[in-house]
Amino acid sequence: VHWTAEEKQLITGLWGKVNVADCGAEALARLLIVYPWTQRFFASFGNLSSPTAILGNPMVRAHGKKVLTSFGEAVKNLDNIKNTFAQLSELHCDKLHVDPENFRLLGDILIIVLAAHFGKDFTPECQAALQKLVRVVAHALARKYH
């Protein structure tokens, strides 16, 4: 993947302002609420019976932070995303059996969360760069699937 200097600047500039805990919790909670079939991968998280339960679930919050912290590794390694996510791809494919389509869904939700958090600072150019990034990350995570 080729990144322009402008794309790199837009991505790193915005990412530097992201509250990983809050945005991660919101993104994962939205995934579980908007696409309820994804909840089956999180059975060990306890009560996911309603949007209120999901939004208040500390395990959802903690895992959301973990997911976005990992996503931050993509931002730090824009030129080597495939290798950055090789182990996570293997884990999600071989052990967790996550449908790779869920990576794309989470990426789209992350864009919505960032747009909501950053308002007018989330310009169309910024959205384009981040949409490209979430596609590349989703592709890297799906790499180990046959």
From Swiss-Prot:
<dbReference type="InterPro" id="IPR002337">
    <property type="entry name" value="Hemoglobin_b"/>
</dbReference>
<dbReference type="GO" id="GO:0005833">
    <property type="term" value="C:hemoglobin complex"/>
</dbReference>
<dbReference type="GO" id="GO:0005344">
    <property type="term" value="F:oxygen carrier activity"/>
</dbReference>
<dbReference type="InterPro" id="IPR009050">
    <property type="entry name" value="Globin-like_sf"/>
</dbReference>
<keyword id="KW-0561">Oxygen transport</keyword>
<feature type="binding site" description="distal binding residue">
    <location>
        <position position="63"/>
    </location>
    <ligand>
        <name>heme b</name>
    </ligand>
</feature>
<keyword id="KW-0813">Transport</keyword>
<comment type="similarity">
    <text>Belongs to the globin family.</text>
</comment>
<keyword id="KW-0349">Heme</keyword>
<dbReference type="InterPro" id="IPR012292">
    <property type="entry name" value="Globin/Proto"/>
</dbReference>
<dbReference type="GO" id="GO:0042744">
    <property type="term" value="P:hydrogen peroxide catabolic process"/>
</dbReference>
<keyword id="KW-0479">Metal-binding</keyword>
<dbReference type="GO" id="GO:0046872">
    <property type="term" value="F:metal ion binding"/>
</dbReference>
<dbReference type="GO" id="GO:0019825">
    <property type="term" value="F:oxygen binding"/>
</dbReference>
<dbReference type="GO" id="GO:0020037">
    <property type="term" value="F:heme binding"/>
</dbReference>
<dbReference type="GO" id="GO:0031838">
    <property type="term" value="C:haptoglobin-hemoglobin complex"/>
</dbReference>
<comment type="subunit">
    <text>Heterotetramer of two alpha chains and two beta chains.</text>
</comment>
<dbReference type="InterPro" id="IPR000971">
    <property type="entry name" value="Globin"/>
</dbReference>
<keyword id="KW-0408">Iron</keyword>
<dbReference type="GO" id="GO:0004601">
    <property type="term" value="F:peroxidase activity"/>
</dbReference>
<protein>
    <recommendedName>
        <fullName>Hemoglobin subunit beta</fullName>
    </recommendedName>
</protein>
<dbReference type="Pfam" id="PF00042">
    <property type="entry name" value="Globin"/>
</dbReference>
<feature type="domain" description="Globin">
    <location>
        <begin position="2"/>
        <end position="146"/>
    </location>
</feature>
<dbReference type="InterPro" id="IPR050056">
    <property type="entry name" value="Hemoglobin_oxygen_transport"/>
</dbReference>
<dbReference type="GO" id="GO:0031720">
    <property type="term" value="F:haptoglobin binding"/>
</dbReference>
<comment type="function">
    <text>Involved in oxygen transport from the lung to the various peripheral tissues.</text>
</comment>
<feature type="binding site" description="proximal binding residue">
    <location>
        <position position="92"/>
    </location>
    <ligand>
        <name>heme b</name>
    </ligand>
</feature>
<dbReference type="GO" id="GO:0043177">
    <property type="term" value="F:organic acid binding"/>
</dbReference>
<dbReference type="GO" id="GO:0072562">
    <property type="term" value="C:blood microparticle"/>
</dbReference>
